[in-house]
Amino acid sequence: MESSRILITSALPYANGPLHFGHITGAYLPADVYARFQRLQGKEVLYICGSDEYGIAITLNAELAGMGYQEYVDMYHKLHKDTFKKLGISVDFFSRTTNAYHPAIVQDFYRNLQERGLVENQVTEQLYSEEEGKFLADRYVVGTCPKCGFDRARGDECQQCGADYEARDLKEPRSKLTGAALSLRDTEHAYLHLERMKEDLLAFVQGIYLRPHMRNFVTDYIEHLRPRAVTRDLSWGIPVPDLENKVFYVWFDAPIGYISGTMDWAASIGDPEAWKKFWLDDTVTYAQFIGKDNTSFHAVIFPAMEIGQSLPYKKVDALVTSEFLLLEGFQFSKSDGNFIDMDAFLETYSLDKLRYVLAAIAPETSDSEFSFQEFKTRCNSELVGKYGNFVNRVLAFAVKNGCTELSSPQLEQKDLDFISKSQKLAKDAAEHYAQYSLRKACSTIMELAALGNGYFNDEAPWKLAKEGNWNRVRAILFCACYCQKLLALISYPIMPETALKILEMIAPYSLDLGSQDPDRLHSLWTDSFFDYSEEKFSLKEPELLFTMVE
């Protein structure tokens, strides 16, 4: 049985560049849709996200940009927070891994793993720059590929032949920043022995939700576990307590940011202990939303880190992965010019158009593609032609004919059948949301709009109006508005602005939105919402929901 308390997290966006449509549809829109749905169900939802602010890519790019590390991550933290707001992502708290609570809990995780014999130190050879007086991580190194001889190969892989290797395997290694020659020196690092938790991890993944095509990947990954270094020779990061001049690898500290971010949230609401009711209570339902490239860290490595703790931290119940979203057949890449400026896009097209199309093409089980042609087709055919047309024509007809106050009339069997079919589709939508399928939810939304359009066409109230059969006209309008009420409900998680407009225009007697936060509608998806017997509608002049995309 699902808990009344729901914890939701989505992969922390890396503070190293702007978010693109692929990021949004892969982790943040699905998490937002699920959060909105669960709030409608009356659940106590906490959706936590935040910036991932450590790691080699940040230090390297900050240095190349001539910026301080904190200055650099501050810039992208603000950008990501603003992007979430513009996209209507209803995150309850957007934290960051430079928050005040993060260092202590990361170091505590490390000590607990040490005490259980799961972290051990090992001396290895790493590349050292005499000129810079420090060890250099792979991203700071270039050299000659040991496989193909390409003389500008990166420190972790060759962009010429695709080979991957350790930076120390490069021939003639040199500093990417200064060009200085590098030498090998011994250095001590801590390693997490994941292979010692293999049986625990296999048992764990059998009990959680994974998309079927990901389960084999995760199981195979666990079967081939090996020790992983948890420390790096860097100055920017969380210091390692017992190793001088070392910080934790970003993959180790970042997922702990979900917990420290919740601590940050608890402090912000004036209840520092509130984080515990989500992270130290196993009756909580925890859903995590990520892109497929983060699967191993969230399905295996972070749960392994939690297994090794003295506190019973909540482990994920549902790990919801997405494949990649391509742009016109290619990966999103600002440097290659295959990129859409999100601000410019939203200045031209409404937010709900974008949210709907991204949800409808969500890469849930395979890579999918965003193209402007499909965006245009879906907006014009589905949002304007089906959805908006149904709402507008019903309300325009009602207002024109003075039928703006509607109450439960005498209904015929065909009306009851229509209401029953509408309710069935709304319940189907609930099932799709509960199973993390935005694509199926979008299909059901359009199916309900088409059902309403078909009913209105078949009953042809304009003909009945000419005959003076106003009781029947009002009955048809009542049923159509009831369908629109359900349409607004099932649309809200994906198209919140549009759903609210519909509810404002039909003004159901049973619904008082005045006391609710419109961005966090709560406890509406109830049996009473579906009851039509005592319902009334007070209709307003229709507002165009969607315009054509040229």
Curated annotation (Swiss-Prot):
Monomer. Its cofactor is Zn(2+). A motif ('HIGH' region) lies at residues 13-23. This is Methionine--tRNA ligase. GO terms for cellular component: cytosol. It comes from the Bacteria. It comes from Chlamydia trachomatis serovar L2 (strain ATCC VR-902B / DSM 19102 / 434/Bu). InterPro entries: Anticodon_Met (IPR041872), Met-tRNA_ligase_1 (IPR023458), Met-tRNA_synth (IPR014758), Methionyl/Leucyl_tRNA_Synth (IPR015413), MetRS_core (IPR033911), MetRS_Zn (IPR029038), Rossmann-like_a/b/a_fold (IPR014729), tRNAsynth_Ia_anticodon-bd (IPR009080). HAMAP family: Met_tRNA_synth_type1. Is required not only for elongation of protein synthesis but also for the initiation of all mRNA translation through initiator tRNA(fMet) aminoacylation. Its EC number is 6.1.1.10. PANTHER family: METHIONINE--TRNA LIGASE, METHIONINE--TRNA LIGASE, CYTOPLASMIC. GO terms for biological process: methionyl-tRNA aminoacylation. Keywords: Aminoacyl-tRNA synthetase, ATP-binding, Cytoplasm, Ligase, Metal-binding, Nucleotide-binding, Protein biosynthesis, Zinc. Zn(2+) binds at C145, C148, C158, C161. Its main location: cytoplasm. GO terms for molecular function: ATP binding; metal ion binding; methionine-tRNA ligase activity. A motif ('KMSKS' region) lies at residues 331-335. It catalyses: tRNA(Met) + L-methionine + ATP = L-methionyl-tRNA(Met) + AMP + diphosphate.
